[in-house]
Amino acid sequence: MAEPLLTEHQHQPQTSNCTGAAVVHEEHTSERPPSAEERVPKEDSRWQSRASLQSGSRPGQEGEGGLKHQLPPLQTNACPELSSLEKGEKGQNGEDLSTGGASPSAEGEPMSESLVQPGHDSEATKQEAPAAGGEEPWGQQQRQLGKKKHRRRPSKKKRHWKPYYKLTWEEKKKFDEKQSLRASRVRAEMFAKGQPVAPYNTTQFLMDDHDQEEPDLKTGLYPKRAAAKSDDTSDEDFVEEAGEEDGGSDGMGGDGSEFLQRDFSETYERYHAESLQNMSKQELIKEYLELEKCLSRKEDENNRLRLESKRLGGVDARVRELELELDRLRAENLQLLTENELHRQQERAPLSKFGD
C-alpha cells in the first residue's frame, strides 16, 4: 500500500528552496487536525513527526497511518519543511487507507511498529554519534587550554639555617672563613671608592699572642698545695689565703677557674690544629725542627734544675737539723730559767724567817 505513495513523491519536482514545499504544505494543513497545529512548531521536523504520529494514533484513526508515520523520511536536499510535508501526506493517505477498512494491516500494526521503531532510533543515534564524538575532543581541548599548568616546583637548594651555637667546629670554621672573606671584599671595595675603612673586628691578634707563648697546660692536673702556716705568719694572713683558695676576685670558686682553664686549653688546641693544617710541607718541617731545638733546650734546663734541687735538698736537711737543735736549746734554756727562779725563791724564804 505504501509503494504508490512513494512513487508519487518521487515524481514530484524537488527544489532546493522551500517555496514550493511551503505551498504544498499549506494545502495539506487544512486537512490536519487543529490539535497538531497547536502543539507542533512549524519549522521543527522532529516535533512535526511526533504530532503526525499522535494524529495517526487518535481513537477512530487506527490503521496503517500509524505505521506509515513511523517510516523514516526520504533523504533529500530539501528543507525540513518538505520532509514534514511528506510525512503529513503519508499520514493523510494512511487515514484514507484506514477509512477504506483495510483490516489485515490493522491486525499487523503492533508487529510493524516494533520493527520500524528500532530502525528509526538507530538512525537517530547514528546521526547524533558523530556530533557527540566531535564535541568530546573539542571539549577536552578547551579544558586543557583553560587549565593552567602548575609550573612552580619546590626548590632543591633550601637553606637549612642553624644558630651559630649549634654549629659544629667544622661548620663554625667554614662560616668564619666565609665571613672574613666577605668582610675583606667589602673593605677592599670601600677603600677603592675612597670611603673610610675600619679594621676588621677580629680577635686574631690575641690568638697570635697565645701562639707565640707556650702556656703550661698541665696546671689544672695537679692539686694545689696547702699553705703551710709558719710561726711568723698571723691568723689574718691565713684567713686571706683561705679566701683566695675558695674563690677569686671574680666570685668563682675552684670549679669555675678549672672550667675557664679547660675551655682555654680546648680553644688553644683547636686553633693550633688549624694553624698546622694550613701550613705547607716545608713549613711543617721547619716547625718540627724548631720544636726539637726547644725540647732539647727544655731538657737541659730541667736537668740543671734537678741538680740544683738535690744540692739544695742537702742544705735544707742541714738547716732542718740546726733548727731542731735550736728548738731543743731554747727548751732547755727555758727549763733552766724556771729552775733558777725556784732556787732564788727558796733562798729568800730562810732569810725572811731569820729576820722575824
From Swiss-Prot:
The modification Phosphothreonine is found at residue 233. Residues 233-248 have a biased composition (Acidic residues). It holds the Pfam family HEXIM. The keyword Nucleus applies. Residues 283-311 are annotated as: Mediates interaction with CCNT1. One of its GO terms (molecular function) is identical protein binding. Widely expressed with higher expression in heart, skeletal muscle and brain (at protein level). Residues 145-162 have a biased composition (Basic residues). Residues 147-174 are annotated as: Basic region. The keyword Transcription applies. It is found in: Nucleus; Cytoplasm. Residues 207-247 are annotated as: Autoinhibitory acidic region. Keywords: Coiled coil, Cytoplasm, Immunity, Innate immunity, Nucleus, Phosphoprotein, Repressor, Transcription, Transcription regulation. The modification Phosphoserine is found at residues 98, 103, 230, 234, 249, 257. GO terms for cellular component: 7SK snRNP; cytoplasm; nucleoplasm; nucleus. Belongs to the HEXIM family. The coiled-coil domain mediates oligomerization. Homooligomer and heterooligomer with HEXIM2; probably dimeric. Core component of the 7SK RNP complex, at least composed of 7SK RNA, LARP7, MEPCE, HEXIM1 (or HEXIM2) and P-TEFb (composed of CDK9 and CCNT1/cyclin-T1). Interacts with the N-CoR complex through NCOR1. Interacts with ESR1 and NR3C1. May interact with NF-kappa-B through RELA. Interacts with CCNT2; mediates formation of a tripartite complex with KPNA2. Part of the HDP-RNP complex composed of at least HEXIM1, PRKDC, XRCC5, XRCC6, paraspeckle proteins (SFPQ, NONO, PSPC1, RBM14, and MATR3) and NEAT1 non-coding RNA. This is Protein HEXIM1. It comes from Mus musculus. The lineage of its organism: Eukaryota, Metazoa, Chordata, Craniata, Vertebrata. The gene is Hexim1.
